Amino acid sequence: LIRYNRLSTIPSSLANCSKLDEFNIEGNNVSQLPEGLLSSLVHLNTISLARNNFNSFPLGGPTQFTSVHSINMECNTIDKIPFSIFSLAKYLSKLNMRENALTSLPLDIGSWTALVELNLATNQLTIIPEDIKSLQNLEVLIMSNNQLKRIPPSLGQLRKLRHLDLEENKLDSLPQEIGYLRELTRLIVASNQLTQLPRSIGSLSNLTHLNVGENNLSSLPEDIGQLEKLEQLYINDNPNLDVLPYELALCTNLQIMSIENCPLRSLPQEIVAGGPSLVIQFLKVQGPFNLN
């Protein structure tokens, strides 16, 4: 095992290990690989260069990733994914570039069509390219802790998406098209600048986890009551959230609701002080739905 060994160089003789299917040098001090090393390991399935000192992709071009299914380069200082670097990576289903220094994504991102999981958290990305719509197999998209200001409507075309994490960005709105993500089970948009949620959020019929805490919401759409599978709702730390829709009581599977640091002035304060379960009970009793 080469992992966590304080190595700063990798011997080029490793190219002779032609049957190697996993190349894992996680947790060392490596900043570059011998040129073409990965290309010579033609049976590679998994590559992890995580937690090293790489500031660019290994030298060797697209042939390095021809047979690879999973690439993990998290926790380096890579500032660029080279154009066409994955042009031969027709099996690449998992790419983790978390905690790097990316400021943009390559123009050919739409060609990464085998991707199922894409983790770009904790970079300096400002834009999600429209072409992301071409990643029709994508199930997990994590772009938390970036500098995103808007979500392209084309994101709504990722019909297999199950997990979308956009926490800690600079979003002030979500597109109506987000309602097309019918397979979505987890939507995390906490710590943004959202002032409202689109009504189409009620179309996310498989959603179990919704986190919209730490935003600037003043209300929630009545359509939230259509989320029959919702189990966890985080609306904490929205300093302008005065009112909750009676429809929230229709979310009968709700188990966890976080409402800390929301004024909820339209509700009796003794109800709010009693916590989430009392709030839901109040909405049931006072609302027009006769849920008792």
Where are these regions (language model features)?
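Consensus "Asn ladder" position of solenoid repeat domains
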Residues: 5, 28, 49-52, 73-76, ...
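A generic tandem-repeat structural signature
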Residues: 1-56, 61
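Conserved hydrophobic beta-strand positions in leucine-rich repeat
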Residues: 1-2, 23-25, 44-49, 68-73, ...
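Leucine-rich solenoid repeat scaffolds
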Residues: 236-291
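The feature encodes a structural signal of leucine-rich repeats
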Residues: 10-12, 33-36, 57-60, 81-84, ...
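Structured C-terminal portions of repeat-based eukaryotic scaffold domains
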Residues: 168, 180, 186, 191, ...
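Leucine-rich repeat
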Residues: 15-20, 39-44, 63-68, 87-92, ...
